[in-house]
Amino acid sequence: MLEKYGRVYAAVDLSAVVENMERMKEALSPQTKMIGVIKADGYGHGAVPVGRELEKLPYVSGYATATAEEALILRRAGLKKPVLILGYTFPVSYTHLTLPTIL
């Protein structure tokens, strides 16, 4: 018989996220703009905490999400940089996307 176990827990070191972005920036030309892809709840690590760290980085010019709902979560959390929605946006979401800088 299988034993019951709890859900998997993953702790994200936000300083490691920033370090990864720093390393990528070092490999690019100075005029290259970067965008933080924060979809699927930051790939399961929490879109808002990851986004808040990326918000502090001047070379990150915005974010990308998979859905309109994810974009709205970032905006409602107070993130100010532009958000690009990568996936299909259903017409029902159009009225919610009149917030500035959601593309």
Predicted regions: what they are:
Residues 1-12:
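Generic N-terminal amphipathic, Lys/Arg-enriched alpha-helix
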Residues 14, 40, 47, 66-69, ...:
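Helix N-cap/beta->alpha junction signal
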Residues 17, 39, 74:
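Conserved, mostly hydrophobic/aromatic
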Residues 18-25, 51, 71:
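Generic structural signal for well-ordered alpha-helices
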Residues 34-38, 63-65, 83-85:
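Hydrophobic faces of well-ordered beta-strands that scaffold small-molecule active sites
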Residues 43-60, 75-81:
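Glycine-rich loop at the start of a catalytic domain that most often binds anionic cofactors/ligands
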Residues 72-73, 79-93:
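Glycine-rich nucleotide/cofactor/substrate-binding loop typically near the N-terminus or early
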Residues 95-101:
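Conserved small/polar residues in nucleotide/adenosyl-binding loops
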